[in-house]
Amino acid sequence: MKKFDKSIAAFEEAQNLMPGGVNSPVRAFKSVGMNPLFMERGKGSKVYDIDGNEYIDYVLSWGPLIHGHANDRVVEALKAVAEKGTSFGAPTEIENKLAQLVIERVPSIEIVRMVNSGTEATMSALRLARGYTGRNKILKFIGCYHGHGDSLLIKAGSGVATLGLPDSPGVPEGVAKNTITVAYNDLESVKYAFEQFGDDIACIIVEPVAGNMGVVPPQPGFLEGLREVTEQNGALLIFDEVMTGFRVAYNCGQGYYGVTPDLTCLGKVIGGGLPVGAYGGKAEIMRQVAPSGPIYQAGTLSGNPLAMTAGYETLVQLTPESYVEFERKAEMLEAGLRKAAEKHNIPHHINRAGSMIGIFFTDEQVINYDAAKSSNLEFFAAYYREMVEQGVFLPPSQFEGLFLSTAHSDADIEATIAAAEIAMSKLKA
């Protein structure tokens, strides 16, 4: 049995200092019924907690660390930049270099604005869509998380297409009423929503692969249908690629599925592990953003040289061949997890998109949030705790996916499959 004495003591102290003892809710490990692990360091595919336990890491800081922890090239570049100054409140050349890379690789982006988080990116993109179209309402999908902006913290009421209800205290109902929510992968509900509210819908915002109900890829024709509906109704299509951007493919989710939106939101990978976000799209739309246009958005640390450097050094190491290798590794892990679950007759459904993998403990095919919620959460929690004992660090929620990095070796994946085999053999009864 692993010992977690130092993590337990650190969490006891933290609960007197921060809400719930953490700075982001999922880190409290509540849904898996254990004390959170306090991490001390990471290198490559491994992380080490303050009690000295080693884990193969599939959290990767919730996705950004596509080259694993403390990538040598990123670390050395950050050291060099930090010695010159961490932020200037003035433009730097590294902003140009990262912007150029993003524009070259993301099909929809002709002009890009750097911000400090994925939430900033989505909030800013919504403001831009509303300002550009002169419309008020947005359409999002149940179970898709786009950051904690008021307009996006909305859940569905009853009915096929509903005006939203706040998903958190503090979100005014008046704000929520401008958010329409429908089921992910349900194109007919989208069409119905446009029949009801189309003249006032500014945009659809969607993850090309839903990542906060587990990993849920789009059904064939779904993204293409959204593109068609928005074009027919004069609304914008926004892809939230904070999670999928440079994760599922060299050209992001839009390249992976061959559908080009009007605006794209990015984050995670483009910061190489530092706080970052970005939104971009057609030049005609992006030129409406201040100072070239009237739609305001600003940020004290936007485009700071540390985040831009980490992002640039991360992206330049990614090539089309990188994603061929990701696909091979991810297929290997997916097949191994499936084989272990089948061997022990454990109800399961595995979804994958590139190097994102989600395993659901349910018999249902998971294509939307309702299906994801059919998962056996008690079983997942027990599985999670056993995987920790076996030295594998997974996202502590059934509704989050696993991420692979270039640092993960075949030996890591084989060890993970062996750990899952042990965990499932213990839990099958």
UniProtKB/Swiss-Prot annotation:
It holds the Pfam family Aminotran_3. It is found in: Cytoplasm. It catalyses: (S)-4-amino-5-oxopentanoate = 5-aminolevulinate. GO terms for cellular component: cytoplasm. InterPro entries: 4pyrrol_synth_GluAld_NH2Trfase, Aminotrans_3, Aminotrans_3_PPA_site, PyrdxlP-dep_Trfase, PyrdxlP-dep_Trfase_major, PyrdxlP-dep_Trfase_small. Gene3D superfamilies: Aspartate Aminotransferase, domain 1 (3.90.1150.10), Type I PLP-dependent aspartate aminotransferase-like (Major domain) (3.40.640.10). CDD domains: OAT_like (cd00610). Keywords: Cytoplasm, Isomerase, Porphyrin biosynthesis, Pyridoxal phosphate. Its cofactor is pyridoxal 5'-phosphate. One of its GO terms (biological process) is protoporphyrinogen IX biosynthetic process. Pathway: Porphyrin-containing compound metabolism; protoporphyrin-IX biosynthesis; 5-aminolevulinate from L-glutamyl-tRNA(Glu): step 2/2. Its EC number is 5.4.3.8. It comes from the Bacteria. The modification N6-(pyridoxal phosphate)lysine is found at residue 268. Its main location: cytoplasm. GO terms for molecular function: glutamate-1-semialdehyde 2,1-aminomutase activity; pyridoxal phosphate binding; transaminase activity. It is an enzyme of class 5 (isomerase). Belongs to the class-III pyridoxal-phosphate-dependent aminotransferase family. HemL subfamily. PANTHER family: GLUTAMATE-1-SEMIALDEHYDE 2,1-AMINOMUTASE, GLUTAMATE-1-SEMIALDEHYDE 2,1-AMINOMUTASE 1, CHLOROPLASTIC-RELATED. Homodimer. NCBIfam families: hemL, PRK00062.1. This is Glutamate-1-semialdehyde 2,1-aminomutase 2. It comes from Bacillus mycoides (strain KBAB4) (Bacillus weihenstephanensis). The gene is hemL2.
